[in-house]
Every structure is written in C-alpha cells, then in structure tokens.
Amino acid sequence: MPKGYVVRRGVQRGRLARNVVVIAGAFSLAIAGGAVTAVPAGADPAPAATDTGNQPATTTPTATTTPTVTATPVADTGAEPDPAVSRIDTVITGEGGQRATAIVYSASMRKMIPIEILRPKDSSKPAPTLYLLNGAGGGEDSASWSARTDYEKFFADKNVNVVTPIGGTFSYYTDWQKDDKALGRNKWTTFLTKELPPLIDQRFGTTKTNSIAGISMAGTSVLNLAINAPKLYKSVAAFSGCARTSDPLGQAYIQAVVGTRGHGSITNMWGLPGTAGWRANDPYINAAKLRDTKVYMTSGSGLPGPYDRLGAKGVENNLDSLANQIVLGGLIEAAVNQCTKDMNKRMTQLKVPHEVINRPTDTHSWEYWAQDLKTIWPKIAKDLGVK
C-alpha cells in the first residue's frame, strides 16, 4: 500500500441541522429569480468539515477497496524509479481474479494513487475500458461505487474493464493552477487523460477504446475531461452533475464543495472567479466541443422517490439518514435537475447530439445512481463495442 494511505470511513448521520447550514448557505446565494444551479456534492451530503489545520488529508483503503490479495510488484531493476515517469507500482488481485487494485504513481501529482479495477469476464482477449468516477469524497469515505452499489456483481458477466481511481477529494478531478494547503497537489486532468490510460492499456491489454462516467461532483468533471481529451472517450455519462461552473451561481456551489467542505481555495483551482481558467472549465460554455462524443445526462427532480423511505436500501430504518436524504438530497437534486435542463437546452441549441433522462422524482442518492448506471450501460456498451 502507498505510504500515508489511511482510512477515512463513513459519513456521520444524525447531524441534519449542521448539514443544512453548510449546503443551504450556498443555495441561498444561488437561488435568484427562480433559477437554481446545482451544488455538486458527494453521495451523501457530508457534515461541515472540522478545522484540520489546513493540512493535506491522507486516506486508506477499506476492506471493500482492498481485496484479499496476490500482489504483483514491478520487476526490481536495482535502480530507483524515475519520479518524472508515471508507473504502475503494484497490482493486487482479489479472489477469482476479476477484482484488482493497482497502485499507480502519478508523476504530475508526485504520489501513489490506488485504482480499483474490475476485469472483464473473459480476460483472455482485449476489452474496452469504462472509467467510473466517484463523487466529492473521491471514494476515500463510505460514499463509493464499491461500498454503496452492487456494481461489481453487475459487471461480473460483462467484457469490459471498469477503472475507478480512489482520491481526488473535493478536487473536481481537474488540474489545479496551484498547490493547496488543505487539498494538496491536484493534476487530475493530466492523470486521468494522459498518465493513467496508457498504463491501463499496456498492463491489462485493453482495446484502447474508452468511455467515462461520474456522479455528482464528478458529473461535472467527466464533461470537462471529455472536452479536454476529445479523442479519448467514445462517450461520457454525467449522473446528477452540473455543467455550469463559471457563472456566479456555479461559483457559489464550487465554493461550497471545495471551500466549505474541503477547506480548499477555489482560486488555487482555476484562478480568480470570472477569469479564463473558470471559463475554460465550464462545460456549458464549451458544450460545442462535445459534438464528437456521445453524451448522456441524468437527474431526478428532488422529490422523494422509491428509495426515499424507511426500510429502503441505503436508508434502512434510520430516521436521520432519511431526513438527510430527503431534505439535503432533495434540495441538491432539484438544483442539479435545473442545471441538467439548462445543459440540455444549450446542447439542443448548438445541435450537439445528446440524451437526457429527467426523472419526475428522486433525490441526490446512491440507489438512483446505481440505477442510472444500469439504465445507461447498454448505450455505453454499444459505444465501446461490447456485445
């Protein structure tokens, strides 16, 4: 395991009032004239972060993210690895061989990054790759595809590699202009579009055909990644993401995620709000650049849906969880829904092909994203050439 990779597990429940202050504070800035833009948050709206002294946080794999292992290190040549070259340091294979964790060194970020990988049903021949991103917590908390969904079971009979990085908490999976005291060095666009794909292709013998999908915060990120690397992905799927980032409303939400929750500086990310860095990372402004990529977007209305009740998966019989999910999850998803409608209108005006699902109910919650993935998968599979 990479040095400093420590567990940060679980979103504390039962703190609804504090959650409302953190998230609703941003919404009060963003609701004007009936127009709402989304606060891209992680899976479960998290409590306000406590003061950590503004130091970089470190994280650790849980039993979910680290399978029972057979570790395959890179051959020792006797020489120190070149810090300017990204590499796969170790591959840890779980029982059955379909689940693996690769420890990847990123030269741009100068650190090891765990990558969760689901291998295809038939690994004897090349398969395409779906890059599947977590939300604001980066998978370092309990809010991750592996911890909150049955995605491993879903992909077990499919001939595709599913690649999910663990990290990037509150980073928007973007290249930050400056290092940040709280969130460290973030060069995620470089890592995800330039460093990681060739390593995955070489080590796992892929077809070099890719798609990408993400939820919440990463629903914004995947659109930007596809814009920045137009030939890398056949398709992009944004589940409950918000495409608008550079207008005052979008800036308020990013401040809520990066600043309020992450204790990071948004000026370290893209510069001063309103400057070129923000416009360059606004999928709404740059929507025309998605013309040659299949685009899928989903969102709910924010009204309670089938998983927003006691006894439902993810809620069980916890009243605090249900209150968080309905109040905060509903508020966030209502804003995301409007943002998705705005992006739909923008892409329609530009005549950029895309598909949108706006559900009449549903909150900002994992069970709906798990269903979104299953709903959109046949389209992504077709894009990737998976039969």
Regions found by a protein language model. Name each.
Residues 2-387:
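Non-catalytic cap/lid and distal C-terminal segments of serine-dependent acyl enzymes
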